[in-house]
C-alpha cells in the first residue's frame, strides 16, 4: 500500500500539509510584475471552499470536473478542491480548439467546467449545445464578463462564497469527504496529447500518484526549502506531477509564471533550486546562448570557448565519478567566475541543484553542454500511462544518452520486438471508456509503451524511437528518425524537424525554423523579407538551413543522411493541429498535411 507520511490518500496528505505548514509560503504568483505569496493555510482554505462550493452545486463523488486554463493559482485551488471533495479533475489545454473541448467534455462526461477567462469560455459556449453532461461553468477571470447573464455560468469568487457558506452550514463536511477517500479512487483524468488518433483519458488513482510522489522523492530529494518555477501546462502529467503533487509531498514552494511569454524572465527572477523542463525549453536556452555568441566580440567568443572546454574536461571526470584534479578545479573556478556563472544566471539556472528533462527525445550533446556549464542534467523516462516516470538517471548512478534505470518499485523489460514494457504501482487503471484500447496497452500488468528500446548489461534503458516511427527505406534499411531529428534540433536555427523516408529511396525532412533566431540572422545579413513565409523562401535562409543539415549529415552513415529538405513556411503555435501542447510536431498530421511538399522532394528521384 502506497503512503506518504502515513497518509493513504492525496486529500489526507493535503490536510496534513495545511495543518503542519500553516503560514509557510506554498505558492507565489506573478501578477503585473509583482510576486504575490499564498500560504499553505490560504491554499487549504481556498481549495476547501472550491470543493465545498461544488458540493453546494450538486457535485457527487466520482464526478468529472474539467479545467481549461494557463498555469495559475486558481487551477491549483480548483484541482485539490475537486480531489478532496471526491471529484475527478481533467485538465484541458488552453490552446485546444472548440471541437477538441467538445470531445474532451463529452468523452469524460464533464459536469463542471472551469474556464480561465472570456476566451476559454467562448470556446465552450460555442459547443455547449452538444455537451449534454455539462451543468455549470466556473470562470476564474471575469474581465470583460461583468455583465454576463447566463444561468450556467458563475465566477470563481462566487463558487468560493458558496463553499464558505456550505462550510458554515456543514462544519464537518470537508473532513468527512477527505476521510472517505480510498487508495483505489479515481482522482485524475489526463488525456494524452498524442501524435496520432483522438486523445485517450488515462485514469490515475490516489495510489498511483502517491507511489509517484515517493518515487520522485527517493530519486531526487525535494524539500520545504526548495523553489520550483511553475510554467508547464497543468493538463500535462509532468506539470501536475511537479507543481501539484511533488510540491504537496515535499512542501516546496511553486512560483507560478505570469504568462508563457514571461517564462524566461520569471526563471531568472525566481532562480529555482530544482528545475524540470521538456527538451524544447533546454534547446531554446542553448540556442539563445549560441546566437548571443555570434553577436559577441572576438574576445568574448574566445573566452567562452576556453571556459566551455574547461567545463567539458571537468565534466568528464564528474560523469566518470572520478576525482577532479586540483589544477582542473582551479581552472574551472576561474572559468566559472569569468564566464560560466554569468551564462547560468542569464538562463536562470545558477541556483539549481539539478536539472531534469523528459517528455521527448533530447540530444546527448545538449545534456553534455549543461554539465559543462556546471549544472548536472538527468534524463528520465515515463508516460502518462505510468503516472509519471518509470526510469531515471540519478546523481550517483547515471549514463548520458540513456534514460536511466528502473525507478524504485518499477520493473522494465523488453518484449520480443524490443518494445519497452513497464510494470509498477504507477501504471494506470486504464483508459476512460476505452476497454479495447486498455486491453491493447496493458497486458498481464505490463504497460506496452509503444517505444523501441534496449537495456544494457548494467540495467540502463535506452529509448530508440516510437515503434510506429521507425523508417524502413526502399532498400530495406531500418532508420531511427528521432536520432537524426535530435541532432537537427541542436541547431540554433531549427525548432523541430520531421524526417521522412519510409519505403522511399532516400531520406528527406520537413524543417520548422526558429523564427526568432532566423529573423535575427536575416536582419544581421541584410536579407529582405516581409513576413514569416517570405523569410522561409529567401535563398539565404535556404542556404543557412542546408548548411545546418550538412553539418548533421556528417555525423551519420550515408544511408542515414538527409538528401533534400523543405521548410514549413507557416508559423505554427500549439493551437495548430500540427503541434502537440508540448510543442512537438505530430508526425502523422505533418505527413498528411504536407504530403504534396514531401512528394515534391522525390519527383525525378
Regions of interest found by a model, annotated:
Residues 496-499, 549-605:
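Conserved C-terminal "lid"/linker of ANL adenylate-forming enzymes
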Residues 406-473, 490:
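Conserved ATP-binding/catalytic segment of the ANL
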Residues 84-162, 544, 550:
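Structural core segment of the AMP-binding/adenylate-forming
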Residues 22-25, 139, 153-154, 161-191, ...:
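Conserved pre-ATP/AMP-binding loop-to-beta segment of ANL
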Residues 6, 26-80, 97-102, 152-160, ...:
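Conserved AMP-binding/adenylate-forming core of the ANL superfamily
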Residues 37-41, 157, 179-180, 187-213:
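Conserved AMP-binding A3 loop
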Residues 210-227, 234-340, 351:
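Conserved AMP-binding/adenylation subdomain of ANL enzymes
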Residues 96-126, 212-229, 260-274, 346:
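Conserved ATP-dependent adenylate/AMP-binding module captured primarily in the ANL superfamily
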Amino acid at each position: 500500500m502506497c503512503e506518504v507520511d502515513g497518509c493513504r490518500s492525496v486529500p489526507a496528505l493535503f490536510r496534513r500539509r495545511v495543518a503542519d505548514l500553516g503560514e509557510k509560503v506554498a505558492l507565489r504568483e506573478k501578477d503585473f510584475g509583482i510576486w504575490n505569496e499564498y500560504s499553505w493555510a490560504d491554499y487549504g482554505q481556498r481549495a476547501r471552499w472550491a470543493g465545498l462550493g461544488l458540493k453546494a452545486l450538486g457535485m457527487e463523488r466520482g464526478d468529472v470536473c474539467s479545467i481549461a486554463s494557463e498555469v495559475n493559482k486558481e487551477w491549483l485551488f480548483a484541482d485539490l478542491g475537486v480531489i478532496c471533495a471526491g471529484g475527478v479533475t481533467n485538465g484541458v489545454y488552453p490552446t485546444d480548439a472548440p471541437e477538441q473541448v467538445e470531445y474532451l467534455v463529452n468523452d469524460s462526461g464533464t459536469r463542471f467546467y472551469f474556464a480561465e477567462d472570456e476566451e476559454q469560455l467562448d470556446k465552450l459556449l460555442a459547443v455547449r449545445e452538444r455537451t449534454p453532461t455539462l451543468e455549470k461553468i466556473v470562470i476564474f477571470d471575469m474581465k470583460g464578463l461583468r455583465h454576463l447573464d447566463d444561468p450556467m455560468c458563475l465566477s470563481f469568487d462566487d463558487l468560493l462564497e458558496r463553499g464558505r457558506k456550505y462550510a458554515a452550514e456543514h462544519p464537518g463536511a470537508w473532513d468527512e469527504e477527505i476521510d472517505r477517500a480510498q487508495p483505489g479512487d479515481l482522482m485524475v483524468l489526463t488525456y494524452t496529447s498524442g501524435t496520432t488518433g483522438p486523445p485517450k483519458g488515462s485514469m490515475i488513482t490516489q495510489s498511483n500518484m502517491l507511489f509517484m510522489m515517493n518515487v520522485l522523492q527517493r530519486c531526487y530529494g525535494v524539500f520545504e526549502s526548495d523553489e520550483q518555477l511553475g510554467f508547464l501546462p497543468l493538463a500535462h502529467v509532468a506539470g501536475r506531477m511537479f507543481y501539484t503533487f511533488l510540491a504537496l509531498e515535499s512542501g516546496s514552494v511553486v512560483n507560478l509564471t505570469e504568462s508563457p511569454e514571461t517564462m524566461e524572465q520569471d526563471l531568472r527572477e525566481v532562480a529555482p533550486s530544482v528545475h524540470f523542463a521538456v527538451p524544447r525549453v533546454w534547446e531554446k536556452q542553448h540556442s539563445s546562448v549560441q546566437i548571443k555568441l555570434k553577436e559577441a566580440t572576438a574576445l568574448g567568443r574566445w573566452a567562452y570557448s576556453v571556459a566551455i572546454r574547461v567545463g567539458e574536461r571537468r565534466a568528464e571526470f564528474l560523469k566518470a565519478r572520478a576525482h577532479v584534479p586540483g589544477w582542473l578545479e582551479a581552472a574551472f573556478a576561474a572559468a566559472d567566475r569569468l564566464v560560466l556563472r554569468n551564462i547560468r544566471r542569464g538562463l536562470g539556472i545558477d541556483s539549481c541543484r539539478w536539472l531534469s528533462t523528459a517528455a521527448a527525445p533530447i540530444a546527448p550533446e545538449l545534456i553534455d553542454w549543461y554539465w559543462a556549464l556546471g549544472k548536472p542534467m538527468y534524463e528520465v523516462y515515463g508516460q502518462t500511462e505510468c503516472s509519471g516516470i518509470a526510469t531515471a538517471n540519478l546523481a550517483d548512478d547515471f549514463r548520458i544518452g540513456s534514460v536511466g534505470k528502473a525507478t524504485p518499485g518499477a520493473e522494465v523489460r523488453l518484449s520480443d520486438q524490443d518494445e519497452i514494457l513497464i510494470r509498477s504501482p504507477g501504471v494506470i487503471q486504464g483508459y476512460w471508456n476505452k476497454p479495447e484500447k486498455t486491453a491493447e496497452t496493458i497486458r498481464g500488468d505490463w504497460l506496452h509503451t509503444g517505444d523501441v528500446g534496449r537495456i544494457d548489461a548494467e540495467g540502463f534503458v535506452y529509448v530508440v524511437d516510437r515503434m510506429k516511427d521507425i523508417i524502413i527505406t526502399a532498400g530495406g534499411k531500418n532508420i531511427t528518425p528521432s536520432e537524426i531529428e535530435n541532432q537537427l534540433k541542436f541547431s540554433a536555427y531549427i525548432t523541430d524537424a520531421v524526417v521522412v523516408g519510409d519505403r522511399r529511396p532516400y531520406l528527406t525532412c520537413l524543417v520548422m525554423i526558429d523564427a526568432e533566431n532566423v529573423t535575427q540572422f536575416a536582419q544581421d545579413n541584410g536579407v529582405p523579407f516581409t513576413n514569416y513565409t517570405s523569410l522561409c523562401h529567401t535563398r539565404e535562409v535556404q542556404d543557412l538551413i542546408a548548411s545546418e543539415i550538412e553539418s548533421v549529415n556528417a555525423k551519420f552513415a550515408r544511408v542515414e543522411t538527409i538528401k533534400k529538405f523543405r521548410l514549413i513556411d507557416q508559423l505554427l503555435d500549439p493551437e495548430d493541429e500540427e503541434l502537440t501542447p508540448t510543442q512537438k510536431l505530430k508526425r502523422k498530421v505533418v505527413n498528411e498535411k504536407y504530403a504534396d511538399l514531401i512528394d515534391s522532394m522525390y519527383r525525378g528521384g
